[in-house]
Design a protein with these regions (language model features):
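N-terminal helix-turn-helix DNA-binding core of bacterial DNA-binding proteins
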Residues: 7-51
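Short, hydrophobic-biased segments on the C-terminal half of alpha helices
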Residues: 51-58
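Alpha-helical transition-metal enzyme core signature, strongest for iron centers
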Residues: 30-33, 57, 96
Length: 125
């Protein structure tokens, strides 16, 4: 099995916490949130995964949504953080801080590894 950089560097388990963080900053609709996740390292080819996460957060009572009709274009579901969502966000910080420590240890140990050995093939005679 080979791990890609995106599988390791951007664990899917961080998406709900990142969505809660973004909604604590300001409410938003799915496409906005998808764009706001990009600087955090998450980039999807479509909004499906974001809407699934938002639906799960709403079912858990961590976010609410309202239908907003804009002056132009179709209406959109706008998501907001609830008090329970803020409490969940506050609790998630300890877990994220733990990940930060784990990543720091991982990188430190990786940097101390000896360089890879090269194998020399002998030419066939």
């Amino acid at each position: 099995m080979e791990l890609s950089d995106s599988e390791v560097a951007r664990p899917r388990e961080m998406v709900p916490a990142c969505l809660l963080l973004l909604l604590a900053e300001s409410p938003g609709h799915g496409y906005q949130l998808m764009e706001r996740l990009k600087p955090l390292g998450f980039d999807w080819h479509g909004p499906g995964p974001i809407y699934r996460e938002l639906r799960a957060l709403e079912e858990a009572g961590l976010v609410t949504s309202t239908w907003a009709v804009g002056p132009t274009g179709p209406g959109r579901r706008v998501y907001e953080l609830t008090a329970a969502g803020r409490a969940s966000l506050d609790r998630s910080v300890a877990g994220v801080a733990g990940l930060q420590g784990l990543v720091a240890q991982y990188l430190d140990r990786y940097r101390r590894l000896p360089p890879p050995r090269r194998t020399v093939r002998r030419a066939a005679s």
